């Protein structure tokens, strides 16, 4: 759910 690249993995992304 973060606009960064490479995208870090957070629970909110799932």
UniProtKB/Swiss-Prot annotation:
The keyword Metal-binding does not apply. One of its GO terms (cellular component) is extracellular region. GO terms for molecular function: hormone activity. InterPro entries: Tryptophillin. One of its GO terms (biological process) is regulation of insulin secretion. Pfam families: Tryp_FSAP. It is found in: Secreted. It comes from the Eukaryota. Expressed by the skin glands. Belongs to the frog skin active peptide (FSAP) family. Tryptophillin subfamily. Stimulates insulin release. This is Tryptophyllin-13. It comes from Bombina variegata.
């Amino acid at each position: 759910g973060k606009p960064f690249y490479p995208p870090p993995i957070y629970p909110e992304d799932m």
